[in-house]
Amino acid sequence: MAVHAPYNHAPPPTQEINGQKPTLAPAITLERPADCINRGQYPAFYIICGYLNRLRADAPHKKYELLTRIFGNWREKVGPDLYPLIRLLLPDKDRERPVYNLKESMLARCYIDILSLEKHSEAAQRLIKWKQPAGNSPNPTGDFAKVCYNEIKARSTVEEGQLSVEAVNMLLDKLAVGKMKQKDYVPILKAINMQCTAEEQEWIIRIILKDLHISIRERGVLSAFHPDAIDLYNVCSDLKRVCWTLYDPGFRLNKNETHLELFHSFLPQLCGRMNDASLENIAKAIGAPKEFIMEEKLDGERIQLHMRGNGAQWFYCSRKAKDYTYLYGAHPGEGSLTRYIATAFQDNVRNVILDGEMMVWDPVVERYLAFGTLKSAALDHFNDETAPRPCFKVFDILFLNDHCLSRKRLSERKRLLRSGKIFKNIENYKGRLEFVDEKRGKNAKDIREYLERVVETKGEGLVVKKTDVIYQTNSRGYDWIKVKPEYSDQMGENLEVLVLGGWWGKGGRSGKISRLLCGLREQAFDDGTVERPSFKTFCSIGSGMSYSDYEWILNKHKKHWRPFDRSNPPPFMKLGPVGLDDKPDVYIEPENSFVIEVKASEIVPAGGYGIGFTLRFPRCKYIYYDKNSRDYALDDESKERDMWTSMSVDDFMDLFSRPKRSYDDSQGPGKRKKRKVIRSKKNHLISNFRGQKLSDADVETSIFSDMTFFIVKGTSDYPKADLEALVHKHGADFTQAQLSDLSAIVISPDQKNPLVRAQIRHGVNVIKPEWVFESIARRTALPFLKEFLVFASEEAQDGRYYNKTLEQYDKVSFVRDRTGGALVDEDGDADVEDEIMDGEDKDEIDVEESRESKNRRMAREDLKEKESNRTLEQKKLQEAWGLRSRASPGDSDSEPEEEMSLKEESDTDSERSRGLRAIYEDEEDGENDSHESDVGVNGDDYRAVPLSGLNDKEEGLMGESPEAMHYDEDRIFYHLAFYIDTAKNAAVNGLESSSPSFDTQERLVKVEKLLIENGGRVARSISDPKLTHIIMDDEDSRRYVELTRKTAMPKRKHIVTPKWVEDCVDEETLLDEDLYKPK
């Protein structure tokens, strides 16, 4: 029996190490258990590479078995300590090697040195410009590790790798000691190059870059390692602790052993995102009419605050386990926050963990500043009482005086937090430590009213929470839901699009690119198999950029702009079939371009653009300066954006096609043939038979649509109620009794229940719960295979697939892709396929590849090539490690050895099902989805116009006419309508009166003149249907709340100061309103 390892909790470091700020919470000083020692020989690293190749090539439902095989072989041959292996499988979660400070550019320079390449040679340029197209060259681009593999393979003389897993880990430790220079990295990488094959170096490079590209993350890996592993990881974020605590697969944790602990970072609970986010649906999902909590949504950084020793030691970390104690202070008297709040707790509070948001408070203007100012505020002006400072806004308490509170209901935790037992007069710490503003509600009306109040106080939105739920680490569900307001001139979401071209300006913008053509990427992501992505034109943007932005666009990219020839457009651009809307004066190659963030009022159909619709009144909100022209380094939180990371067509369709609808043949051209699945006729369920009430908002897929389940009994992991919720989540109805026509699908693991035996007497199929789990893992309802049936009717026994095993059925691989099509696995057994499919059925199969299946196919082809080059000795070692115990690509003489894996009715079944779900969830999180559309097989047909984001009503639309699409480049306020908050206008509209100063009146008169001169329309009534903005002076802002309330419908209006108008005129463009709200 395993024993717990003792832990010595070391306080987190507070100073910089080797001049570098720590990026992850420090690992715990951990003592290895006495019997958790590896006594066998570590395998050669190429064995792990073989497993990684298989993980990359296998379908999701096969990865769990492969992982359990890896871990089982390791325990048998090496020992119980799997940490050296798991840290290689999850490099981005390795806290002992948090950063290598090695990105693609540095690795490219190092390998140019190691391979003795001439700097300007083609090979060197392929490494340096690894994302750029290679013309007609067969060499891959877009995947740096694969580019390196090709260059190394062409020059390496290493036929068999010499390094073990232990040796590779030691070399990686050397690379991660801190920030080094190229001359320091080269000797270590050269040692790797001299002892590793090109294949091994490819995987080492992926480990260094912390992205293995195997579509599996911590949930899948840890679920295969141990049933309790993910629960423990969620509360400690420490792989070593997980591996050393759960080294014995037979040991199970008690519930109190997965509690939160002091000075251990954990993965916090996050907000879910609803497909249909109307306030009524949000209220239903959150439990209305039961009471719920509404909190103000804050624009800061999620932070955990740990304190112990009656305030002697403090620890701050982000939701991604980044340690910020060096900023805020580890001890009283230190940092930009701890020194001011160290005395805030009651004397009897020995230790505590708080969850909250770190904001920036400006004491001069008495308001919170933008999130981007947080780090500078935390670093500077420790002793300046007038300078902006960090302010921790608390919304939850999770630990108190050695007791974890995460399993207490939210209502209890809230009551304790505000009881006066935690803080001494927290109001005395205003601007440093505060409660999040919150209120109770019971319906959509309460949400609407509180949202209005938050907007009136210049807030961002709400978070609505259920009161009767526990705190769930690393969860993003409907227990917490985010609510944001909508404004009259913009949609709820901004888009990140790539610039494809531009038009020369006139007048004041003469000689500059004044309008930009932007597009959406066709490839969903960079898989390294194409030279570069192609783009469909989407919108043109000429507003929102300042004078300096136009200068940067012209000067930094002067050599990249090329004349556009309408008769011979560049091949990467897919244009609209009609008109000149997307025919620019100049274009720019994607690899030289940059990404901009755009907001707009709505989406409208438009045949003049390649995608078939465009944005109405688009405005540039932010420019992501490309790496080559940036004059500064990105910080830890920043994300590089380029042609591979800009918004894709699929991303766009996902964002603006909610709620999702399954495609059917009635939706127009480009019809997709589907394999027919025999399903029970939908019945109208009498309310008494429905059982628990579940919201339609919880439905995420249509796997079981048109099916009704009668679940008699569940499993230990999924009791009856949970199983009902699961099938509902995937589109099914459920009933508490069999339907009159006996069409409800009966689910039970056995026939012990009298209700089940009654169904059997009527000849009704009784199906095991595993059928549900396996169907979800494959994203389609499986046929009734014998191994899933407790009792089979004569009709089921006559079924085509009844006597096939799941393994045999998988060879045909009717795995539903994300667009609803069925796929034939090219590696499927041809004989089996012919045996169970007739010609007519084959014609019904849509053989268009989904993105993930294409990646797996290419990975299998790559695997075949690599396996064909194995030496006899390597093949023997692979066989000993289970890599050749089943059919490897190209082998035909080996058979699967997993016949019994699903037939054994034991705890292994439920663990396997749980593991399959974890693998599936990892794939969902790790990639951009492919979505329903009516695009044809060739991909050239237009998709259906999104369901939401499109406005089919002319009333209340922006613009002087429904045909207006863009802001005017010369008259920047044209198409906008302004109400000026003067005392005279207030009287006309029945608003509160005021006596503004002469200066205030003068400023508003001047602003009105500027608006009219630059195309704006001034409205005297706040009820004007076209109203978009309200101008309010800082010195007469008493009507802010009143105007916010009275102009909220149908969408809210921007309330800005006269300074916004003046700065827009100076910059000759529309600027971001968020920076100009009245005080």
Swiss-Prot record:
Cofactor(s) essential for the protein: Mg(2+)
PROSITE patterns cross-referenced by the UniProt entry: BRCT, DNA_LIGASE_A1, DNA_LIGASE_A2, DNA_LIGASE_A3
Record: residues binding Mg(2+) 2: 460
Residues annotated for ATP binding in this entry: 295, 297-298, 302, 357, 395, 460, 465, 482, 484
Keyword set includes DNA damage: yes
InterPro entries tied to this protein: Adenylation_DNA_ligase_IV, BRCT_dom, BRCT_dom_sf, DNA_ligase_ATP-dep, DNA_ligase_ATP-dep_C, DNA_ligase_ATP-dep_cent, DNA_ligase_ATP-dep_CS, DNA_ligase_ATP-dep_N
Record domain BRCT: where: 699-789, 968-1078
EC number: 6.5.1.1
UniProt-listed GO biological process terms: DNA biosynthetic process; DNA recombination; double-strand break repair via classical nonhomologous end joining; double-strand break repair via nonhomologous end joining; nucleotide-excision repair, DNA gap filling
UniProt keyword annotations, A-Z: ATP-binding, DNA damage, DNA recombination, DNA repair, Ligase, Magnesium, Metal-binding, Nucleotide-binding, Nucleus, Repeat
UniProt-annotated catalytic positions: 297
Molecular function GO terms recorded: ATP binding; DNA binding; DNA ligase (ATP) activity; metal ion binding
Stretches for region Disordered: 1-20, 838-942
UniProt-annotated binding residues for Mg(2+) 1: 357
Biased composition (Basic and acidic residues): 848-878, 900-914
GO CC term, one of those recorded: DNA ligase IV complex
Annotated catalysed reactions: ATP + (deoxyribonucleotide)n-3'-hydroxyl + 5'-phospho-(deoxyribonucleotide)m = (deoxyribonucleotide)n+m + AMP + diphosphate
Xref: CDD domains: Adenylation_DNA_ligase_IV, BRCT_BRC1_like_rpt1, BRCT_DNA_ligase_IV_rpt1, OBF_DNA_ligase_IV
Localization in the cell: Nucleus
Composition skew (Acidic residues), residue ranges: 838-847
Entry keyword annotation includes Repressor: no
Family: Belongs to the ATP-dependent DNA ligase family.
Protein task: DNA ligase involved in DNA non-homologous end joining (NHEJ); required for double-strand break (DSB) repair.
Protein name (record): DNA ligase 4
Gene source species: Cryptococcus neoformans var. neoformans serotype D (strain JEC21 / ATCC MYA-565) (Filobasidiella neoformans)
